């Protein structure tokens, strides 16, 4: 989609606030009659022909810089006051009502502000209207001031307008999976959003639920235990959760959908606060190693890393790559990611030509990562030599070896060798990270021979290796595990699942040396990342995935014992990972993975595993394994437009007392959550009568914990 830079409007007003000049600022050569700015001009101000000015107000300016720019734009040498009818600019009242210098009141405290334009003017990327008045024409002339224009701003703007026609602003924006915001979105706003979804008739599945103090929610044919008393959920057409809100926190996976839904309705919420990361794909490559040739601190701040920029307020970080840009924003600002992408593309056109791909190891651009740098006692960085020693044995077309040294020759004919003065790091190998990402063979010096490594085989012998080589190093539990890594289980589950199993580690590190079988944590289950934020998400995932899930010190089972699959998942930082058995021989780096011993956890499941009918009528049968119609399990998704609320559903004392012995087998401190999750579903499914609750439970759930669990 091609990004269109929105026009801007500057209105100079006189003593009666009548419009003396209306400047339509645009980098294009025409008026966009479909733009909100032109509609505002024509419909609200009755101005049909404004002055078209080929200029652009940078949204990254501070108020003082903006004031100097506007004085220059309008050629005003007097003190001025700037304001807007939509947002407060340099002045605001303590209660945040809109400031107007012509209707000033002393009953409210007035605050002066010198923040950045895109921060104080919500929606400035799409609709910016600034009113300018001479201070002497207002009721508060003492509040006016004059600011000199920053010539660097004018110089940059001039260059921007010159390169603008050649800019390729064809971009595609996607938001980072599962962004979480803070806001004050309450019941009224949530209801308006759900109504908007239904009015649009876009076939998105939506659900608005309200919970009692025990968090019981009933909708369609499934029951959800949730830690939120109020929840809005909307799913994309492919069934992916697009956004979810509990009234205080908004989880947004599809930012475009969210902004479209709330763009023209009053949801009675303040500006959303929280982190969000955008990935912007570019149609035309840029140079990621950006260099600014003039002073541009009013736009970006350069960092020590040449492909990372910061916004002037240091709250937005921009990471550049050849074909995409990643932008991390502290607070949600509509379309700021597109605007900053526009500025980056423009700066590339001004100061940076796109470089052709070059070998990492050309002499003029020698680069090694931090893991291959020399330190006090380690000399890991290879050196460049000009010739081969006589008598060196040719191992391949690009690798030679003798008793004293090894030499690698890259594609540019540059020779690398390792000559550690301490006589330790003299074996040439290659950095896995660059080879895995880009197939770059970056030499590094190692303690031991590297010829058995897969990366060595690829770089020296051109033998293809698997793309997803797993490192034999086992990480401590707690961090998200990538495809090429694995980690230990939490201590309690490591001891339980690996009882009787051993893993031999190399001395002084966590590198796996050999094992005939050991439970570890592998990367995310399946091809897609699955993130579970709430207890409701966890329960829904377990029942749909039909496998065991470990969350902190709790084990979640599917509601139906017969559904329990042969996988074990574990949640790390809200991301679903897999528990697997790893096997490795000491003589090889090859790592093999096998399914876990799921029966160790499955045998802890306390529910009756034999399907028993509870109630039947007219071909419909409710059993301990689900609801059947004419012998077929009923699992259809019912309409989410109709919501049923339950009030004051509680777990009775008799139920809690009956199952209390079971808790000694439950690895959890959250026993109340455990019994509510389980028992409430039992009561609802069985329509339990309080008068005969004990006999009913004994009939269908005899293993209450009084008998030993095997």
From Swiss-Prot:
Location relative to the cell: Virion
Membrane-spanning intervals of the chain: none
Keyword field: Activator, DNA-binding, Late protein, Transcription, Transcription regulation, Virion
Presence of the UniProt keyword Repeat in the record: no
Disulfide bridge positions per record: none
InterPro entries, per database record: Poxvirus_early-TF_lsu
GO molecular function, one term: DNA binding
Keyword Transcription regulation: yes
Domain of life: Viruses
Gene Ontology CC terms: virion component
BP GO annotations: positive regulation of DNA-templated transcription
Main function: Acts with RNA polymerase to initiate transcription from early gene promoters. Is recruited by the RPO-associated protein of 94 kDa RAP94/OPG109 to form the early transcription complex, which also contains the core RNA polymerase. ETF heterodimer binds to early gene promoters.
Family: Belongs to the poxviridae VETF large subunit family.
Assembly and oligomerization: Heterodimer of a 70 kDa and a 82 kDa subunit. Part of the early transcription complex composed of ETF, RAP94/OPG109, and the DNA-directed RNA polymerase.
UniProt-recorded name of the protein: Early transcription factor 82 kDa subunit
Native organism: Vaccinia virus (strain Tian Tan)
Phylogenetic placement of the source organism: Viruses, Varidnaviria, Bamfordvirae, Nucleocytoviricota, Pokkesviricetes
């Amino acid at each position: 989609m091609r990004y269109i830079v929105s026009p801007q409007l500057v209105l100079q007003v006189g003593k009666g606030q009548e419009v003396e000049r209306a400047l339509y600022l645009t980098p294009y050569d025409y008026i966009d009659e479909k733009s909100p700015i032109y509609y505002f001009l024509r419909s609200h101000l009755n101005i049909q022909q404004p002055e078209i000015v080929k200029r652009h107000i940078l949204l990254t300016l501070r108020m003082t810089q903006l004031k100097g720019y506007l004085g220059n734009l309008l050629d005003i040498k007097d003190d001025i006051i700037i304001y807007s009818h939509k947002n407060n600019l340099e002045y605001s009242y303590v209660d945040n009502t809109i400031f107007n210098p012509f209707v000033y009141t002393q009953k409210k405290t007035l605050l002066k502000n010198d923040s950045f334009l895109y921060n104080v003017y919500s929606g400035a990327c799409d609709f910016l209207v600034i009113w300018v008045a001479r201070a002497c024409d207002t009721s508060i002339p003492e509040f006016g001031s004059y600011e000199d224009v920053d010539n660097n701003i004018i110089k940059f703007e001039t260059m921007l307008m010159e390169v603008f026609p050649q800019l390729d602003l064809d971009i595609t924006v996607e938001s980072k999976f599962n962004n979480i915001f803070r806001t004050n979105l309450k019941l009224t706003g949530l209801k308006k959003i759900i109504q908007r979804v239904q009015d649009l008739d876009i076939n998105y599945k939506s659900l608005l639920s309200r919970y009692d103090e025990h968090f019981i929610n009933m909708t369609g044919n499934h029951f959800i235990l949730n830690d939120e008393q109020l929840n809005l959920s909307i799913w994309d057409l492919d069934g992916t959760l697009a956004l979810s809100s509990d009234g205080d926190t908004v989880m947004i996976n599809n930012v475009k959908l969210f902004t479209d839904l709330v763009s023209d309705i009053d949801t009675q919420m303040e500006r959303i606060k929280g982190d969000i990361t955008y990935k912007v794909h570019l149609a035309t490559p840029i140079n990621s190693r950006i260099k600014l040739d003039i002073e541009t601190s009013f736009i970006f701040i350069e960092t020590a890393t040449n492909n990372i920029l910061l916004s002037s307020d240091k709250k937005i970080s921009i990471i550049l790559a050849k074909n995409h840009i990643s932008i991390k924003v502290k607070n949600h600002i509509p379309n700021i990611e597109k605007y900053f992408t526009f500025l980056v593309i423009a700066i590339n056109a001004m100061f940076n030509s796109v470089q052709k791909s070059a070998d990492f190891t050309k002499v003029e651009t020698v680069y090694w990562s931090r893991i291959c740098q020399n330190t006090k006692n380690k000399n890991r960085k290879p050196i460049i030599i000009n010739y081969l020693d006589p008598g060196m044995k040719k191992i391949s077309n690009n690798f030679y070896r003798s008793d004293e040294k090894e030499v690698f020759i890259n594609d540019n004919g540059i020779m690398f060798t390792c000559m550690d003065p301490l006589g330790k790091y003299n074996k040439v190998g290659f950095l896995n990270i660059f080879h895995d990402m880009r197939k770059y063979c970056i030499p590094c010096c190692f303690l031991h021979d590297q010829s058995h490594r897969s990366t060595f085989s690829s770089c020296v012998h051109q033998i293809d290796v698997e793309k997803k080589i797993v490192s034999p190093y086992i990480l401590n539990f707690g961090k998200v595990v990538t495809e090429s890594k694995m980690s230990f289980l939490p201590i309690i589950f490591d001891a339980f699942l690996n009882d009787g199993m051993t893993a031999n580690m190399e001395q002084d590190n966590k590198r796996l040396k050999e094992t005939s079988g050991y439970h570890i944590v592998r990367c995310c289950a399946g091809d897609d990342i699955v993130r579970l934020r709430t207890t409701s998400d966890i329960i829904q995932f377990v029942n749909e995935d039909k496998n065991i899930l470990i969350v902190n010190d709790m084990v979640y089972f599917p509601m139906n014992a017969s559904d329990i699959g042969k996988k074990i998942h574990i949640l790390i930082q809200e991301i679903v990972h897999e528990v697997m058995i790893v096997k490795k021989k000491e003589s090889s780096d090859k790592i093999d993975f096998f399914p876990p011993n799921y029966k160790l956890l499955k045998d802890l499941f306390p529910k009756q595993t034999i399907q028993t009918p509870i109630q039947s009528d007219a071909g419909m049968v409710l059993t301990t394994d689900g609801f059947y119609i004419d012998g077929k399990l009923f699992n259809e998704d019912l309409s989410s437009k109709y919501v049923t609320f339950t009030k004051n559903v509680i777990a009775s004392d008799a139920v809690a007392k009956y199952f209390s012995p079971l808790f000694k087998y439950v690895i959890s401190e959250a026993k109340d959550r455990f019994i509510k999750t389980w028992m409430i579903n039992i009561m609802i499914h069985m329509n339990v009568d309080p008068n005969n609750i004990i006999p009913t439970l004994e009939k269908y759930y005899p293993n209450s914990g009084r008998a030993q669990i095997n």
